[in-house]
């Protein structure tokens, strides 16, 4: 089993040609960016009524609910994916089997400073009314 800081570095060294020392350090420190990281793992199980995509979506929904609960408790959380999610080689380094996929990482901590204000979004860009 790997030490958590080695998983991402080993993967990067095996798969990226243009690695700098700075980038290697970034990957080495990734697991320490927050006091707690929840790794969201979707486990595919053959089921006649629940297709694989619904199983993955359900894991994502569980992750979103975790984030909502954390926010309600005053914690900060950010969901990250990137090269280290939906990646069989990373899943293997975590000791997962072929039916398991990492769909994301939730970094959890106590927010520092004021909450950033976000620009208002026009919901018409995302919602359609079907009459």
PLM regions: where:
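Solvent-exposed alpha-helices and their adjacent loops that cap or buttress functional pockets
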Residues: 29-32, 96-99, 119-121
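C-terminal helix-cap and adjacent tail motif
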Residues: 102-131
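Short leucine-rich amphipathic alpha-helical surface patches
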Residues: 70, 94, 110-112
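Small-aliphatic-rich amphipathic alpha-helix that forms the alpha element of a beta-alpha
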Residues: 38, 44-92
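Short, electropositive alpha-helical surface patch
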Residues: 90-103
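Residues that scaffold the ATP/ADP-binding catalytic core of kinase and kinase-like folds
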Residues: 4-7, 89, 93
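Structural motif
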Residues: 35-37, 76, 101-103
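Glycine/small-residue-rich phosphate/adenosyl-binding loop
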Residues: 3-59
